[in-house]
């Protein structure tokens, strides 16, 4: 018996060891892939998860695949995420019904007077349809939310809309209410926001009006969202390490089925991906098919060209720009000269002056003076910096300032158009002012300065596109202009998580904070889209997008080449009040997008799987991508000929008044030599919802390779001005 027991024990130990070894091999050789299978089958006996498990068993040869299956997408579209080897991935990609198999990549976050700036005033000063606004649900896919924030209080709210099919699954000590009606977590951390990003974006889109808010006295005023009476559903897909593709797809799968009216998502890749490998493009397509508009951020990789993310035409892509309010932080030198820098500095040093030390003068033995001037890590001698204001030629000094004992920091800002928050007194100077500061330091035996608390300034020139905002052209669908629109995304005050850091290595905790990024611009447009939808609940996503784009303000963008063109701002700056009365709209449906994808050379077989419909990509059913009925017109030229001729075909739908006559007018862009003919030049609409088609032929020669040629087409009936940008370009020269 003893020998039997010993043998059994030994066998069990060997079995555990073997299984552990196999598990280790699987973990080492596999990675998470997403298997996208298009629309859900209409067969009554089809069970998605069973199909997914069957595929895995077939490919892996394993009867138990619980350790392989990560997620199953089964509510709004079909697919799954699983741990696969490269050979297994290849096998699955060949299976009938599979559209694409792509790695689970990690995406990144695209991180109050703004609504007043756009003309949406507080209280009774703004026209609202409160009954429908209260039935509008905005899905926020982000880092979660802080449910206790006043911005999400349900005081005065009735029960959730009857159409709501979601849940409150926020985790421990997380409670939803009649304002924050839903919460889902895909990170195993719970839906509570620990970074502040998701709380910030949610309150910008749909937060309640909260008076007397500020960041330690900076930017004092009322914080509110665009549609404060609407409901919010929070979907947490991001952690400190990023946002996984498989979680993003799962959040779309749920949000669509839960019954949201609109999705705002301030997340993306640094560069665009092909549609079938892009989780946001996939999710947004199925949202569009269900009548749900997806609004997303353009990215923060500007002003370099071709950096815009979210380039699919069924995604509303938002750039970031300034408002008329800004923050400046003055630096007063020992000689009395004042330099106006940029930061959000809440530290009050009472105007006291401290010694200045330039990084290169505090170089340690590990670095040369040039590297130390940038305040690179491990380059500074602590004894020379302690108790002084550190002066750096770049932003890296913020990471080491505290460790070397600096009392404050002044740097040459790489983004002098933006005020950033820091964990110690700071000011970022323009290159010219920084040069002046260095000259002062080098001319004095005991240079000193004071870094003052931030001041708020108004009535500055605006809107201006932020330098960080990602630029086009679109590298996936080259004839679709992206970004689509711009909105406030610089120095935005909104709700924040008390568990989050207002800046890196910051020990302070706040309920409202200031951030900049296309992440902040995106929820502004989401709020506007929801606002328009409250007046036109039957409008499709494309009609809402068109109304916003064709009524946008003209804007300015600084920089050389494409950085200052429509590739920076699309149709212009969002104008919420004008969007309520566009007159005419460019309308698209699912079939139009399928025809567009046919024109992008997707096969009939693939598109049938994606759409769930019978698709034939014949000459009759496919369209050139530039002829998609989009509110903007863009074409990339071959560049082989000095002369060119391009035609765009469009159709407008009358949503204004019956018996309307619209006349066309073309306004050429600065320096443009384009010849543009509109046929017919006049459109007559007898009834509301009537459609009329027209074509725009653009001819010219010798288009500049660095700057696109552009114009604006305006259809006007004397009351409405329906404006669409027209852009033609050859290639893009990287100006970096």
Curated annotation (Swiss-Prot):
CDD domains given in the database record: PA_subtilisin_like (cd02120), Peptidases_S8_3 (cd04852)
The gene coding this protein: SBT4.12
SUPFAM superfamilies noted in UniProt: Subtilisin-like
Ranges where the PA domain occurs: 353-437
UniProt keyword annotations, A-Z: Autocatalytic cleavage, Glycoprotein, Hydrolase, Protease, Secreted, Serine protease, Signal, Zymogen
GO molecular function terms attached to this record: serine-type endopeptidase activity
Cross-referenced Pfam families: fn3_6 (PF17766), Inhibitor_I9 (PF05922), Peptidase_S8 (PF00082)
Name of the protein described by the UniProt record: Subtilisin-like protease SBT4.12
Glycosylation sites: 173, 220, 381, 459, 601, 649, 659
Peptidase S8 domain mapped to chain residues: 114-580
Compartment annotation: Secreted
Annotated S-S bridges: none
Naturally occurring in which organism (per UniProt): Arabidopsis thaliana (Mouse-ear cress)
């Amino acid at each position: 018996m003893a020998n039997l027991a010993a043998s059994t024990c030994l066998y069990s130990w060997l079995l555990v060891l073997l299984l552990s070894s196999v598990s280790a091999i699987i973990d080492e050789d596999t990675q998470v892939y997403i298997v996208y299978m298009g629309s859900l089958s209409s067969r009554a006996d089809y069970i998605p998860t069973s199909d997914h498990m069957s595929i895995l068993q077939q490919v892996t040869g394993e009867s138990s695949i619980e350790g392989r299956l990560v997620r199953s997408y089964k509510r709004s579209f079909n697919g799954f995420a699983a741990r696969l080897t490269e050979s297994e991935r290849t096998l699955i990609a060949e299976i009938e019904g599979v559209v694409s198999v792509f790695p689970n990549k990690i995406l990144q976050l695209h991180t109050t007077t703004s609504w007043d700036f756009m003309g949406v005033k507080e209280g009774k000063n703004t026209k609202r349809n409160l009954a429908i606004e209260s039935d509008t649900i905005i899905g926020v896919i982000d880092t979660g939310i802080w449910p206790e924030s006043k911005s999400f209080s349900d005081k005065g709210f009735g029960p959730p809309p009857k159409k709501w099919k979601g849940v409150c699954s926020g985790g421990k000590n997380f409670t939803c209410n009649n304002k924050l009606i839903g919460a889902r977590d895909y990170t195993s951390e719970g839906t509570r926001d620990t970074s502040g990003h998701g709380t910030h974006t949610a309150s910008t889109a749909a937060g309640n009006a909260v008076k007397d808010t500020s960041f330690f006295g900076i930017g004092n005023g009322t914080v509110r969202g665009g549609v404060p009476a609407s409901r919010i559903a929070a979907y947490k897909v991001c952690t400190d390490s990023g946002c996984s593709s498989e979680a993003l797809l799962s959040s779309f799968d749920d949000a669509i089925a839960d019954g949201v009216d609109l999705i705002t998502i301030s997340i993306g890749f640094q560069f665009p991906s092909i549609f079938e490998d892009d989780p946001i493009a996939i999710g947004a397509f199925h949202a569009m098919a269900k009548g749900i508009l997806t609004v997303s951020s353009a990215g923060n990789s500007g002003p370099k060209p071709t950096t815009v993310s979210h380039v699919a035409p069924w995604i509303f892509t938002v750039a970031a720009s300034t408002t008329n309010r800004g923050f400046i932080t003055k630096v007063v030198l020992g000689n009395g000269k004042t330099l106006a820098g940029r930061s959000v500095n809440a530290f009050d040093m009472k105007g006291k002056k401290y010694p200045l030390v330039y990084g290169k003068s505090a170089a340690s033995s590990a670095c040369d003076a040039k590297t130390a001037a940038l305040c690179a890590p491990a380059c500074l001698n602590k004894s020379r910096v302690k108790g002084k204001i550190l002066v750096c030629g770049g932003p890296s000094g913020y990471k080491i300032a505290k460790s070397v004992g600096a009392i404050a920091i002044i740097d040459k800002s790489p983004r002098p158009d933006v005020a950033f928050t820091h964990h110690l007194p700071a000011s970022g100077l323009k290159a010219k002012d920084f040069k002046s500061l260095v000259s002062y330091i080098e001319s004095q035996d005991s240079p000193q300065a004071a870094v003052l608390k931030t001041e708020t300034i108004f009535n500055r020139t605006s809107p201006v596109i932020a330098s960080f905002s990602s630029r086009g052209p679109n590298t996936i669908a080259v004839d679709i202009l992206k970004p689509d629109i711009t909105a406030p995304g610089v120095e935005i005050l909104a709700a924040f998580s008390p568990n989050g850091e207002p800046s890196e290595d910051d020990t302070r905790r706040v309920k409202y904070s200031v951030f900049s990024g296309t992440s902040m611009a995106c929820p502004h447009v989401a709020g506007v889209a929801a606002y328009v939808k409250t007046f036109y609940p039957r409008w499709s996503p494309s009609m809402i997008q068109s109304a916003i784009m064709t009524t946008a303000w003209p804007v300015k963008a600084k920089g050389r080449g494409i950085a200052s063109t429509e590739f920076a701002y699309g149709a212009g700056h969002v104008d919420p009040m004008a969007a309520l009365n566009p007159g005419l709209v460019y309308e698209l449906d699912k079939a139009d997008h399928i025809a567009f994808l046919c024109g992008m050379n997707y096969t009939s077989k693939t598109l049938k799987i994606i759409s769930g419909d019978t698709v034939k990509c014949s000459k009759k059913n496919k369209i050139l991508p530039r002829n998609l009925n989009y509110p903007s017109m863009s074409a990339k030229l071959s560049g082989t000929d000095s002369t060119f001729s391009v035609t765009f075909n469009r159709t407008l739908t009358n949503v204004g008044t019956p018996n309307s006559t619209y006349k066309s007018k073309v306004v050429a862009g600065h320096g443009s030599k384009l010849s543009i003919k509109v046929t017919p030049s006049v459109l007559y609409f007898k009834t509301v919802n009537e459609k009329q088609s027209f074509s725009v032929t653009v001819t010219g020669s010798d288009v500049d390779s660095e700057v696109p040629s552009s114009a604006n087409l305006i259809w006007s009936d004397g009351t409405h001005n329906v404006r669409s940008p027209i852009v033609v370009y050859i290639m893009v020269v990287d100006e970096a």
